[in-house]
Amino acid sequence: MSKKIMMVILIIFTKFFSSTICFKCGTDLIKREPVLMNNLKPNNKRRLANEYTPIKIKYDYSQLIEQDYLSGNDLNDLINLFSEVGESFRSLLSIVHEDILVDTDDLKNHCEIDTYSSDIYNSLITHDLLIFPVINTEMDEYTMAQSWVCLYANNFRPTVGVVEINPNFSLYQIDAAYSMKYLLLHEISHILGFTGFVFRNLNFIYSETINGEEIFYINSTKVIEKAKIHFNCENIKGVALENLGGVESAGSHWEARYMLGDYMISTDYSEIVISDITLAYFEDTGFYKVNY
């Protein structure tokens, strides 16, 4: 094959790849101090302790709409994707609901949210988790989204979070809607508790040094149980996390060398699955019951 033909093939491949590029998650780059819910005002009304119901996620698009970066079609398509992702989590996770009254001062001071719907005060009475999708104009071209939890309950369960979207995203490239849906599943999973902050505070991190490098693992009970089945290995002590240097920086993603294809690695991948190992983590937190 001539060099000229090979160059043409390479150019075609590169153009195709750029239209289906798998974007990275920027969550591990966000450095914000988590706030526990003593800054919220819990209501006295509670359900029975063992009454689990499918999780209900409330999205407040007020600030996203006010920012006015997205065209009508892009905005509607993005809202529809968020709704689809919410329904996906309703089919996967159940939770014991607790009524919480939202304090708008907390939203402003800890979540950087100053535009919200008129019914925001009761959002965590009607729902279990409150999420604000917003535009972030400072992301690089390969980071299409990132997320963070701004308010936690006293047991470290997330209650309010923010999903930041790159305004340059497009749902009209090849497979873009599919990729964005899985990226939103990924980002909202961080808000549900797949974060280094929760890992550490629930004592789920185990480390060992291999060839001079400190490796961090999630070693919670059901994660190990599912990992033994998945990898067909009875000696597994945990599932490795991305190593960002030091226990305080243990990443909020699985190590791709071992979990390539799982939706909670830090970069998107062409064939994504929600693995039983990741679902087992959510069950191990004690926040949720899981429908595997």
Predicted ranges, named:
Residues 18-185, 191-292:
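Extracellular zinc-dependent metalloprotease catalytic-domain scaffold
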